[in-house]
A protein has these predicted regions:
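Sec-dependent signal peptide recognition
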Residues: 1-2
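Boundary at the C-terminal end of the N-terminal hydrophobic targeting segment
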Residues: 9-13, 150-151
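Extracytoplasmic small-molecule ligand-binding "clamshell" domains
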Residues: 13-76, 116, 120, 163-245
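Ligand-binding clefts/hinges and TM-proximal coupling segments of bilobed small-molecule sensing domains
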Residues: 39-42, 46-47, 124-166
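Sec-exported extracytoplasmic/periplasmic mature domains
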Residues: 66-70, 85, 125-132, 138-145, ...
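Extracytoplasmic/periplasmic mature domains of Sec-exported, cell-envelope-associated bacterial proteins
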Residues: 230, 250-252
Length: 275
């Protein structure tokens, strides 16, 4: 097992790596950022320099991988574990840890909705304090991945093991429109019947229950997140933010404000087909 502390010394050549689209940064810029960031690579051989390609959805990315248009896909550890436990046709090529440059899960709002954002912040802080956040992580992330592993279901990553989430209804209460991509099971998932399931939905249901809000869910592609907010078609969007050391952030366009983060990833898998 090789540990490489970056800026890493890469072997000659490049590897085409797919990932779900980031906002406010190009694939070329992201490739440069990764090459010059501080991270740890664990693999059997010297890594080649990754060249990143963005896709508007997870399904498009996997199709590109299966078609040979890219060599690998990059996914967070929890998503990768779920995907691997459900699919024998893929394997881990390398593991990348970015302790100083974590990716954060939060909620995105139009900057005009500062009050709504602050109410979410308060609820998230309370959930961290009273243990609810840890409980939901155990049920919807660790618990789901364990169930998938034990069943050893070999199928598409859209699996029935993800626990459905129920949203309470409040008569006469305001309704918020929340956009979800469904691109990161068991974190973010849209079932075939259109219902939101997984960890993000569970977090949202808990917050909405505490705030007395009704929720209408909208299924979108990752690249449409900012436009959904700016157009007013959505009040809230599940957000995946890369916070770099020193406070520099990308994937946060002008006019978008983010809530207190409620989860973070600092370990990622590069997955490739077994054949």
């Amino acid at each position: 097992m090789l540990l490489v502390f970056a800026p890493a010394v890469f072997a000659a050549g490049t590897h085409r790596v797919g990932m779900v689209e980031r906002l406010n940064v190009t694939p070329e810029e992201f490739s440069s950022m990764v090459a010059n960031s501080e991270h740890v690579v664990m693999m059997a051989n010297n890594p080649v320099r990754p060249e990143f390609f963005f896709y508007r959805s997870m399904s498009q990315m996997i199709m590109a991988l299966n078609a040979g248009e890219i060599d690998e896909i990059l996914m967070p550890e929890d998503v990768s574990e779920y995907f691997l436990n459900a699919n024998i046709d893929y394997t881990v090529n390398c593991v990348v840890m970015t302790p100083k440059d974590p990716f954060l899960l939060s909620f995105g709002f139009n900057s005009d909705h500062k009050e709504l954002c602050e109410s979410f912040d308060k609820a998230i802080v309370e959930m961290k304090r009273d243990g609810t956040l840890i409980t939901l992580q155990g049920k919807y992330i660790l618990g789901v991945n364990t169930a998938v592993m034990e069943e050893r279901v070999i199928t598409d990553p859209d699996l029935q093991q993800i626990t459905p989430v129920t949203f309470r209804k409040f008569d006469g209460a305001p309704e918020i429109k929340v956009a979800v991509t469904g691109d990161m099971p068991p974190i973010d998932y849209i079932a075939p019947d259109g219902s939101a399931q997984g960890f993000n939905a569970a977090i949202l249901a808990e917050i909405a229950g505490r705030l007395g809000l009704n929720v209408k869910l909208l299924n979108i592609e990752s690249g449409a997140r900012a436009s959904m907010l700016s157009s007013g078609r959505a009040d809230v969007v599940f957000w995946f933010e890369h916070k770099r050391a020193g406070g520099t952030k990308h994937d946060v366009p002008d006019g978008v404000i983010l809530s207190e983060p409620y989860y973070q990833f600092d370990t990622f898998y590069h997955l490739k087909p077994t054949k």
